[in-house]
Amino acid sequence: MGGMLAANTGGARLIRYGDVRHNTLGLQALLMQPPGELLEMGNRLHKNNTGPDWKQLFIGTAGSYGIVTQAVLRAHPLPRQRATALIVPSSLEAGLRLLQDAQAQFADFLTAFEGISRNALASVLRHLPQVNAPFDPLPDYALLVEVSSSSAASEHFDLDKLFM
């Protein structure tokens, strides 16, 4: 978690859940100056317009202002259903159109849209022999698309309609 806070990462599901900054409710940090001073930041209000949100200075700054010693993060419920596809677009433009179409059709159900290079796929296959190659030969680029919902079975997940 420390590395994620230091870099403000988002991961594969950033498109749905946001980055670490968005999901951090509170922090405790050991300040660089004055050395050793412990600062606690955050509160229980989701929206707080009473002044600067000081905890944001410590997220994504790689420890420049202090070292995060504790963090309180928002937890999201696990989806009750999920559909994932690994797709090889015919071109960069086709990949961008796919993103636009997925956003239009699935809206808030779109959970992940990630590009994966041939080198990344090859590395996975090299280091995880239990994983089967999804394509032969490996494409220059593939897209991981995921939709999910906390609801029971839904008609929103007609992936064939989008991808075929």
Language model feature labels by segment:
Residues 1-164:
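Noncatalytic alpha-helical scaffold of FAD-dependent oxidoreductases
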